[in-house]
């Protein structure tokens, strides 16, 4: 996984609860002379929420994030992929909800497709064998995914796609990763980003590990030791960070005041995701990132 700066930085989509975006004819826009009139972030968010309410004449379409699971022609999806990714995406959804609520924007979060009560994965089997896919295969995989979704009546040019790639190999505690792991741009209509799937990847792996498991992980260099906790923080954190790019969020840094909470998600927050569940400070959403998601 590498940090990639996305060139297209337009607002895409994140679903807001109807109570927050619904029409409210009694809402009046407060007046002010200067943005600096607001003495706190909470005052800013209250004002912005009132503006959004007053300009909403109809409920917004509940447009959902499409999660695609891609795997090669000569392989099957990685073990327990549906169960693990249901847990991962539910936690990511909860992260956005909690952070947006903390910033004063009610229950704003990503909207996920569900099937039989769990996350719906659009499974796409590639046309090439495993050996033909690498970290640089994003464009190739994108084309195959777009074609497969088109056959299902989905126009990928108007969707936000998180493509989870089953491009890794696990041999006991040795993990080799060769999946695309980056965003490929976003605007108000669409976005696309890639992440990797591995057998050891799960929400349980973010919580204290009494067994003190050490993995040997190879991605861009040789094998490196990772605790199970660090492995899941880095790669689930990488998933939500790249999804941020898919939702048009640029890289940013926390203000001095914000930094007391931990690390900005769209800064180096992919390396601190859910560390607060164990020891230390985790990742958080900056107010500037939140504003792009409204």
Where are these regions (language model features)?
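Bacterial Sec-dependent N-terminal signal peptides
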Residues: 1-27
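Propeptide-to-catalytic entry region of secreted or membrane-anchored zinc metalloproteases
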Residues: 29-185
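Residues that flank catalytic or metal-binding motifs in active/ligand-binding sites
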Residues: 63, 189-191, 261-262
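An active-site-proximal "capping" alpha-helix that borders the catalytic cofactor pocket
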Residues: 92, 246, 266
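A structural motif
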Residues: 183-220
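Short pre-active-site segment immediately N-terminal to the catalytic Zn-binding motif
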Residues: 218-239
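Active-site recognition of the HExxH zinc-binding catalytic motif
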Residues: 234-250
